[in-house]
Amino acid sequence: MAPSLWKGLVGIGLFALAHAAFSAAQHRSYMRLTEKEDESLPIDIVLQTLLAFAVTCYGIVHIAGEFKDMDATSELKNKTFDTLRNHPSFYVFNHRGRVLFRPSDTANSSNQDALSSNTSLKLRKLESLRR
């Protein structure tokens, strides 16, 4: 059937659910005014709620389209073994490997630069404390 029919059915179901909720609220306020708060909802409001819920669910199921198989083999049969566990979104290129596996001559010079800047920073802190 046409998708607009199912969308219309969902719309009618939602409207009926809203009407049932409004009717229940109105019935409750009427019961408060008449001081009969221990009575339950009338059967017509309960039936309208259940029928509207069923109609809405039926329309939503038809709008959703075909369900996928619960068995994973239908999706896995199109994939090769190499692409099965390949998750490129988990690749990390910004990691400590650059520092650990850098040539030794650049590593030593950067360590010396870091040490000299560190000692000058400590000396500046000590000078500010003496004043």
UniProtKB/Swiss-Prot annotation:
Sorted UniProt keywords: Endoplasmic reticulum, Endosome, Golgi apparatus, Magnesium, Membrane, Phosphoprotein, Transmembrane, Transmembrane helix, Transport
Cite the GO molecular-function annotations of the record.
cobalt ion transmembrane transporter activity; ferrous iron transmembrane transporter activity; inorganic cation transmembrane transporter activity; magnesium ion transmembrane transporter activity
Keyword Transport (UniProt): yes
Q: Name one GO cellular component term.
A: early endosome
Residue ranges of the TM segments: 4-22, 44-63
UniProt keyword Phosphoprotein, yes or no: yes
Name where it's found.
Answer: Endoplasmic reticulum membrane; Golgi apparatus membrane; Early endosome membrane
Q: Which residues lie on this side of the membrane: Cytoplasmic?
A: 1-3, 64-131
Which stretches are Lumenal in the membrane topology?
23-43
Q: Which InterPro entries match?
A: MMgT (IPR018937)
Q: Name one GO biological process term.
A: tail-anchored membrane protein insertion into ER membrane
Bilayer topology reads:
Multi-pass membrane protein
Which domain of life does this protein belong to? Eukaryota
Where in the sequence is Phosphoserine found?
Answer: S120
Concerning PANTHER family, the annotation shows: ER MEMBRANE PROTEIN COMPLEX SUBUNIT 5, PTHR21181
As for family, the record states: Belongs to the membrane magnesium transporter (TC 1.A.67) family.
Summarizing the function annotation, the protein's role is: Part of the endoplasmic reticulum membrane protein complex (EMC) that enables the energy-independent insertion into endoplasmic reticulum membranes of newly synthesized membrane proteins. Preferentially accommodates proteins with transmembrane domains that are weakly hydrophobic or contain destabilizing features such as charged and aromatic residues. Involved in the cotranslational insertion of multi-pass membrane proteins in which stop-transfer membrane-anchor sequences become ER membrane spanning helices.
Quaternary context: Component of the ER membrane protein complex (EMC).
Q: What is this protein called?
A: ER membrane protein complex subunit 5
What's the name of its gene? Answer: MMGT1
